[in-house]
Amino acid sequence: MFSMLYFPMVSVLSLLGADAPTHLHSHLKLILGGEFNAALERSSEWAETTVASERTSWDLQLHADLQLVLGFEVEAEENYRRAQRKIRGSNSKIRIATCRNAAWQALFRYRVTTALACFSRICDEPGIEAGGLMEARFGIACALYEMGRIDDAFDAIDSMEKIAEQQSDEMRAHWKDLIAVLRFDLVVQSELRRAAAFVDHVYWQSAQSMSRVDRAHGVSEAAVSVETPLLRGRVAYLLQLRCAAAGNRDAVAELARCLDAAGEQGFVDFRYTLRLEIALALLAGDAPNLAQFVLEPISDTLHGAESSRRYREYFYCAAKVHLAQDHTQESLALYRRYALIAMRCLREDALIGRQFLVGQELKQLPQSDDVTVRLPLKYRRAYHYILQNLNRSDLSVREIAAEIGVTERALQNAFKIYLGLSPRELIRSRRMERIRTELVDFTLTGERNVKEAARKWGVQNGSTLVIAYRKEYDETPSETLAR
């Protein structure tokens, strides 16, 4: 996915915006220059030569981010855990870190709805700093794009611009350059997938219809004026992609150089994304044989049983190549696989409410659960037990601990470490979410009152309800119902 290119830059910018150690500026310079491998090598050297007590959560997190984006997923997961254990301060910081780390891992594993749930929860944290909030909004934009919701992705990026104004002059300039290129990237991606040759690309054709004139106005001019080498290189690539889609064969050599550069950086997964983008452009430009050549390294690694979101675009491109070459049966077989994956994705994505919009006071949160992916397997059972018994007013921590065979203290510690919440706080939060959903869903009909919703979810005392609800949403249940 194209977000892999921007992620390291967003990561280090968000850290620098949080008064992180000054030596992270050297990492920023390497990352802005597109030298991810060199940044990882420097980070690895630091990890090997620094005693454990001197390693900060920021250092470990950035190290894990670089590992994740360059394909070292197992090592990244371990370093995320180490970073989380280093966090000192409020429970909010722990919740933000665990949500954030789980979100990026989920996104790069193409578990898009889980990533969106995690990122959206970060945005609801009252203690989130400007850099972390912009990173979460960027993550939301990436997840929404992968779901084909380009209009909503644009809205998420637009919301970043307002937050960028809170940054220092240097950081604000970097964020604004990033936002300018992100907008241009989305415009080009949308143009490419909605080209006349791709009317049968059902996943994208069934998605929201972006107003190209409104969205594209002034976008390319802002993007071509950026000075950051990493972003400038991406803009040059996108311009060549447009040329290839228009049938200009001279663009192919430059696109091939971009592929080679990604390989030299060890950017394996991003190189996969580039191949798909280039193949789409070549197909749009009526060059199916060149598209086949670009796709061959992917074809050689497939085993025949791939069915995840990751392969959706590949099967579509391969089907179009075979159709152009009059291999009708092969094309039909590949298109069936594409259509099956596309339908699975659409069904999964349908779990996300249509009302999900960034920055609105009352928004319907994604139903995909972020807590499960943040907890170790044993303690996921405890969480699932909580969800199954939320309606019981007598649900206790002792009962939950006994259900999974651990002590109350062990359960408390695990929830604090991985969620930044105690079991009681999680129960209260989930109950308030359910009550709020009841009130919002029935606002138009008036068939549900506050007391009924509270009793349904195990809250018997009116004062307890008002205090807990106000703590979660900064308003009373009656105020929600009155909207």
Model-assigned labels for residue ranges:
Residues 26-27, 63, 102, 140, ...:
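Structural register within alpha-helical repeat arrays
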Residues 44-48, 81-88, 119-127, 158-169, ...:
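Amphipathic alpha-helical segments of tetratricopeptide repeats
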Residues 442-480:
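Sequence-specific DNA-binding recognition helix
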Residues 33, 70, 109, 147, ...:
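Structural motif corresponding to the intra-repeat A-B loop/turn of tetratricopeptide repeats
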Residues 383-395, 415, 419, 437-447, ...:
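Basic, amphipathic alpha-helical hairpins
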Residues 421-455, 483:
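Terminal helix-turn-helix DNA-binding modules in bacterial transcription factors
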Residues 21, 58, 97, 135-137, ...:
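Residue register of alpha-helical TPR repeats
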